[in-house]
Amino acid sequence: GISGLALGIFLKENNFPCVIYERSSKISEYGAGISISPNGKDVLEKLNILEELKAISGNSKKTIFYSNLKEITSIDTDVLTTSRKNLYDLLLKKYSSLGGEILFGYELNDVDIGEKQIYFANGISHNVGHIAACDGIKSKCRQICFTSEMPEYSGYSVWRSILDQKQSNISFHLGPGFHIVSYPISKNKTSFVAAIKTKQKNEESWMLRGTYSDLSKDIPVEILNDYEALKNTQDIYKWGIYTRPKIKSLYSNHLTLFGDAAHPITPFIGQGGCMALEDVYEFSKILKSNDSQFLKTQKEYQSKRLKRIRFINKASMNQGKLNHINNPLLVFFRNFIMKNTNIVSLMTRKIWEYRA
């Protein structure tokens, strides 16, 4: 994923030997867009892939907020909106250009963090110097090393698709019990995401297919009519949003956690990918300054990241609640404050100004 490839690049650039083990037979991402705000773009610039990614992505300069199909307010933004596949492809290209090794078809079976031994489902095992767990929300590494912390359903599920439809700005539709965000990921394609508040759990998966008919039961057709391409695609997916209990540690013995393996968050402020990028840059920077002393690096990494992680997690959960307000009076006050104050710009600035 994002964190593994980005970490590999930073390690190779600093002459740290590393190898990436990938469960899948190839890197792929279906039906998924990603937004990268200035804090994440700063890391992409350090990876030397920002300009190349911008050239094939959407580069939205404005975000518009709607309620009941009426515009509430808009803000200027400097957000890179693209597909995960585009980002993955460039990260892989960069990592490979540095002589980086990646082994596909290596599904993790077990790990001994005391002996630093990794065991794979294909029968192969390797002894390593340190283990970087970048294996996502269903992290096998985390299950083995942090057995009491299992993913928990957040109460939200999300519909998403990539549409053959042009769009220049980022759009938010706020509604009772749901919200929609859409943004351009290239000149001719748009990412569509609709989040709903529901007690019905859905599997956390990129590949759980849904239908337009089911989507229209969760989201008003009047809003879906703005996205005509939804009616003509079979690539509509639905997945549940899962988080973990309050994060207390980012490492255990000779293993360190990154990205969703460390701190899966709800997607309501678009910081999942950015947080993964911040994680790996911070870790690699500290590792270099500590002359490869991993334990010292782990402690400093955790000290620097935990406060940020908890702030973003709380901000994202609160944003989800604001987006999905049902009470008409509270909706009125929310919209009034958004329209007549600079609260939206202030909140985004607080998140985006951070630099790892």
Can you describe what each PLM-predicted range is?
Residues 3, 26, 138:
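Conserved Rossmann-like nucleotide-cofactor binding loop
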Residues 335-356:
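C-terminal auxiliary extensions adjacent to catalytic cores
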Residues 138-139, 158-160, 178-181, 262-263:
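Histidine-centered metal-chelating micro-motifs
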Residues 19, 101, 191-193:
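A structural signal for isolated positions on well-ordered beta-strands in alpha/beta enzyme cores
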Residues 9, 16-17, 49, 100:
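Short phosphate-binding/catalytic loops that engage adenosine nucleotides
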